[in-house]
Design a protein with these regions (language model features):
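Hydrophobic alpha-helical packing residues
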Residues: 70-74, 212, 274, 405
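Active-site gating loops and adjacent loop-to-helix segments of metal-dependent hydrolytic enzymes
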Residues: 56-82
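Active-site alpha-helical elements of protease catalytic centers
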Residues: 89-111, 358-362
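Short glycine/serine- and small hydrophobic-enriched flexible loop segments
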Residues: 100-104, 366-370, 403, 407-410
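Glycine-/proline-rich flexible loop or hinge segments
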Residues: 75-86, 106-113
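Ribokinase/PfkB-type carbohydrate-kinase core domain
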Residues: 1-65, 86-90, 109, 115-347, ...
């Protein structure tokens, strides 16, 4: 487990240096390990350059997104492959991307639950999925299926317009009995996406998702939900409010999803309203930056040394140096908010907006896992006088999530190929000193 983000003081984080006050007997003890669990609709993003005649041939609508059946997807894929039209094949899926990035950042294990084609040919899209996935991701619990995993075709016309064709294949065929209870005992979080419980009637995926939530609650593992898209929320906002209230600890969303969920156009106000249902909110707001909202114990609150910020809640970041906690674990819970503007004003050229939110969430998950890891290995540390959700403060997690988002925006793939640099360039070094 790498230290989350950068800091001058690392509190004898039990990786490189051990606390010299801990007895030799305890040092000889085997270090406790942890991991993050995620359930995903396993799919591959396939990019290809095509002409308008190709789009018409397959009955697609230029510039729009359409769901296609498996037979049409197979014909389309084979034609693209035979004519060497495919420019990129990336492993995709919101949770797959998030777990991959977590494993790259933390240099530690994550566990993916989902489906995988039992018959994999070299060069096929299932093969590409495995090739593009971090070796620190445990894929041993994937459920084999006879058909294809999901495919999302991004067909790029000569004028640059993107047309999407989505084939779900067998990606929603994950069964409840394929969710192993034993992996939840030492997990730091269970990560889900809203898409999992919104499938066709008869698909087993929603039942499998609820089984995982049941195990997470049994072992006191925080359940994290990423909203996915505003269209999922718009269909039935009240359903999602109830779902968050009943099952979710942490929610990650963008400003559009926040508005669909709460009715508030301002991301800070949306995050504040979401605290009625969950304990911690991560809200990305594009060029405006990133907000966090949550609770902390009143007696453990820490005042910021940074300028107080105006907003729909006056001086909302007053206690952003506090650490997030589950509301029910606090004797006197108080709300805490934090905000950060895009790192370095954002990349000079944004190469890919797909996955920046997943990147921000992977940084938050790393910090949550680091807290679990530190608490298990240095239980008598002053860091654990209260039961906190993260290792770092609201402010520090914002900084870390923001930095990871920047890295994803500046590259083509939503999956990081390497962790953050050990040292920033001299001009950016001050970012971590704030």
């Amino acid at each position: 487990m790498k230290f989350p983000g950068q800091r001058k003081s690392k509190h004898y984080f039990p990786v490189h240096a051990r606390d010299p006050l801990v007895s030799q007997a305890q040092e000889a003890k085997k270090m406790s390990r942890t991991h993050i669990i995620g359930i995903d609709q396993t799919l591959v993003d396939i990019e290809a350059k095509v002409d308008d005649a190709f789009i018409e041939k397959y009955g697609l609508s230029k510039g729009h997104s359409l769901v296609i059946d498996n037979d049409k997807a197979e014909m389309l894929y084979n034609e693209l492959k035979d004519n060497n039209m495919i420019s990129n094949e990336f492993a995709g899926g919101t949770i797959g991307n998030t777990l991959h990035n977590y494993s790259v950042l933390a240099d530690d294990k994550s566990t993916l639950l989902g489906v995988m084609s039992e018959d994999i040919h070299i060069g096929s899209y299932s093969y590409r999925y495995l090739c593009n996935t971090s070796s620190r991701m445990d894929l041993n619990y994937l459920q084999p299926v006879p058909g294809a995993i999901g495919r999302c075709f991004a067909l790029i016309s000569e004028d640059g317009e993107r047309t999407f064709a989505i084939s779900e294949g067998d990606m929603n065929q994950l069964r409840a009995e394929s969710i192993p209870e034993k992996i939840f005992k030492n997990a730091s979080a269970l990560v889900l996406t809203a898409y999992l419980v919104r499938c066709k009637e008869g698909d087993p995926m929603p039942e499998a998702t609820m089984k995982a939530i049941e195990y997470a609650k049994k072992y006191d593992v925080p359940v994290v939900l990423t909203m996915g898209t505003k269209f999922v929320v718009q269909d039935d906002p009240q359903y999602w409010r109830d779902f968050l209230n009943d099952h979710i600890t942490v929610v990650a969303m963008n400003e559009e999803e926040g508005e669909a969920l709460t009715g508030a156009t301002d991301p800070l106000e949306a995050a504040n309203k979401a605290l009625e249902w969950v304990d911690l909110v991560l809200c990305t707001a594009g060029p405006v930056g990133l907000y966090m909202a949550g609770y902390t114990e009143d007696s453990a609150k820490r005042e910021t040394s940074l300028p107080l910020l105006p907003g729909t809640i006056a001086e909302f970041n007053q206690f952003e140096f506090s650490r997030p906690a589950v509301k029910d674990s606090c004797e006197n819970p108080i709300k805490v908010f934090s905000h950060i503007s895009p790192y370095m004003g954002g990349p000079e050229k944004i190469k890919n907006t797909n996955g920046a939110g997943d990147g921000a969430l992977s940084a938050l998950l790393h910090d949550m896992a680091a807290n679990h890891y530190h608490r298990n290995n240095v239980p008598n540390s002053s860091k654990h006088q209260h039961s906190f959700l993260t290792y770092s403060s609201f402010s520090q997690v914002c900084k870390y999530s923001n930095r990871v988002s920047f890295e994803v925006l500046a590259q083509h793939s939503p999956r990081l190929s390497r962790g953050l640099p050990e040292r920033e360039d001299s001009l950016e070094e001050a970012y971590w000193e704030r």
